[in-house]
Amino acid sequence: MKKIFVFALMAVAALTANAQNIQLHYDFGRNIYPDQEPDRQKVTVTLEQFKADPWGSWYYFVDLDLTNKFFRSAYTEISREFKLGKESPFAAHIEYDGGLGRDDIRSFQHAALLGGAYNGHNEDFSKTWSVQLLYKRFFKSYDYTWAYNSFQLTGVWGLTFANKKCTFSGFIDFWRAENSKPDRYGHGMLVILTEPQFWYNFTPHFSVGSEVEISNNFIYNTYDDKTFFVNPTVALKWNF
């Protein structure tokens, strides 16, 4: 596992060289929910890139959760879209989600996604949006996980306003998961996850803002029956 984790970090380093922006988040979740989220990360570094080309677009992000000594885990989502016609708003969407941690507890279940997307924007690209309907296949990734079929509905948005000084962006995901808690083992559930971000852009390169992770059935909580969580961050962003 250590060798795989080191290899994953090397791959992340390669992605860093091509990143469009880098974000540093300080997470308050563990302060808000000390019993339900005692091991939640405090600091996350996010690398992100979107790149359009004649065929469609590439998008990826990598989240690196940090400890005071080393990386704790790395999670990535990488997607490719192929336009269905030169002027068509529809596209075929292929995606991989997954990551690795320093142990199974902090690892992520891997998944492949395939489906369609409807994309749009206004004339100056200050407003962008996307809706994706996807088949999702989870893979057995570590102990107490198993392979199963699922679906995912995703919405993505971006809005720049106030003479380009403010940016509001984010996504919302809905997908079917199977519960791994002992008393609900294998039971289907609907997971909802959204992470809106607000940025004040001091310069075209430097921004200060916040991300708020709002979820239901997403956080693995063994303390009680709580399933709904709101985890805010304070963040810095640098656009290359």
Where are the regions that the model predicts?
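Repeated loop/turn-to-beta-strand initiation elements of outer-membrane beta-barrel proteins
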Residues: 55-59, 85-92, 122-129, 159-168, ...
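Outer-membrane beta-barrel "beta-signal"
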Residues: 228-240
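Residue-level signature of outer-membrane beta-barrel architecture
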Residues: 51-53, 82-84, 116-122, 157-161, ...
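Membrane-embedded beta-strands of outer-membrane beta-barrel proteins
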Residues: 47, 76-78, 114-116, 153-157, ...
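Transmembrane beta-barrel strands of outer-membrane/channel proteins
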Residues: 24-28, 60-64, 94-98, 131-137, ...
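Outer-membrane beta-barrel transmembrane domain signature
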Residues: 136-207, 213-218, 238-240
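Short glycine/proline- and aromatic-enriched beta-strand/turn motifs that initiate or cap beta-hairpins
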Residues: 18-67
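Solvent-exposed loop/turn segments connecting transmembrane beta-strands
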Residues: 37-41, 65-73, 100-109, 139-150, ...
